[in-house]
Amino acid sequence: VLSPADKTNVKATWDKIGGHAGEYGGEALERTFTAFPTTKTYFPHFDLSHGSAQVKAHGKKVADALTTAVAHMDDLPGALSALSDLHAHKLRVDPVNFKLLSHCLLVTLACHHPADFTPAVHASLDKFFSAVSTVLTSKYR
């Protein structure tokens, strides 16, 4: 459960990210494919090379979904219901991949905003990404 302090940290961090969210989403997705090659199996139709326009575009979709989640932290299940259905029923993404991408998102944000990435902010973002992952995998059961 996200505390009021967690929500404040997440919103403040997302505000600082601003227009870079799509760029960071693409970078985190590319990092995920590099660090965890098994995640590539869900994207056989993508050019997965460094700097790929397809990876960047999908990373922007990830970032846009997270921006929606930040705006609706008090109702993540409602805000992410359609994405949960898509990933559970149509795409059948292995739930572990959300944890892997979350880790790569944390690394990417820490690289770009080291001064802002305090232990408290790290913990809040980790809890937030975990909450988003839980919602996205909730319809698997």
UniProtKB/Swiss-Prot annotation:
Heme b binds at residue 87. It comes from the Eukaryota. Heterotetramer of two alpha chains and two beta chains. The modification Phosphothreonine is found at residues 8, 108, 134, 137. Involved in oxygen transport from the lung to the various peripheral tissues. Red blood cells. O2 binds at residue 58. Gene3D superfamilies: Globins. The modification N6-succinyllysine is found at residues 7, 11, 16, 40. It comes from Phoca vitulina. The modification N6-acetyllysine is found at residue 16. One of its GO terms (biological process) is hydrogen peroxide catabolic process. Belongs to the globin family. Residues 1-141 form the Globin domain. This is Hemoglobin subunit alpha.
